[in-house]
């Protein structure tokens, strides 16, 4: 069983954190939540873009948590992030470490009416997606698999929130879809 640590990059509603924790546990992961907030700092913020540099943040998370006994460490924050060469990222991962940026998963980011259930659903998908990357999965061609690549929030909506059979088999976990 994989051990996962969730860290808050910003102050997050407990409903979000508990929903993610429950979703991952239902998929067979052992999940712990670090209750301390891993505050984003100004050095990681690009004032011209009004976004956080995901590459630098990921390195900082890795340095901070590299001695922790987890298979994966996932940081979740109500922020907007970018990576070199990309206008934005929903998330970014390396082996063992991942980040999820929630700002663009909210309907109100696009000037639309708040939809909390859709926001939670999108969050579950993107956290699961980045977790898959931290455990060695690449993008999947199965449009229903959570590991399918998303270039827009509409793409996030189209895919499922679980790993397909092939991706589940690679991780040797039970698929709950």
UniProtKB/Swiss-Prot annotation:
This is Archaemetzincin. Zn(2+) 2 binds at residues 140, 145, 164, 167. Binds 2 Zn(2+) ions per subunit. One is catalytic, whereas the other seems to have a structural role. One of its GO terms (biological process) is proteolysis. Transmembrane segments: none annotated. HAMAP family: Archaemetzincin (MF_01842). Belongs to the peptidase M54 family. The gene is amzA. Keywords: Hydrolase, Metal-binding, Metalloprotease, Protease, Zinc. Pfam families: Peptidase_M54. The keyword Transit peptide does not apply. Its EC number is 3.4.-.-. Monomer. Zn(2+) 1 binds at residues 129, 133, 139.
């Amino acid at each position: 069983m994989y051990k996962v640590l969730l860290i808050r990059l910003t102050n997050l509603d407990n409903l979000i954190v508990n929903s993610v924790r429950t979703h991952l546990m239902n998929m067979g992961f052992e999940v712990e939540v670090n209750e301390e907030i891993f505050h984003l700092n100004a050095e990681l913020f690009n004032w011209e873009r009004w976004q956080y540099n995901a590459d630098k943040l990921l390195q900082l998370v890795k340095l901070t948590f590299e001695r922790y006994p987890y298979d994966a460490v996932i940081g979740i924050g109500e922020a907007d992030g970018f990576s070199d060469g990309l206008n934005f990222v929903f998330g970014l991962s390396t082996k063992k470490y991942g980040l999820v940026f929630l700002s663009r998963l909210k309907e109100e980011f696009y000037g639309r009416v708040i939809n909390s259930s859709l926001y939670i659903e999108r969050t579950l998908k993107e956290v699961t997606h980045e977790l898959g990357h931290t455990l060695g999965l690449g993008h999947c061609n199965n449009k229903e698999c959570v590991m399918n690549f998303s270039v827009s929030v509409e793409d996030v909506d189209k895919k499922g929130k679980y790993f397909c059979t092939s991706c589940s088999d690679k991780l040797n976990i039970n698929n709950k879809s």
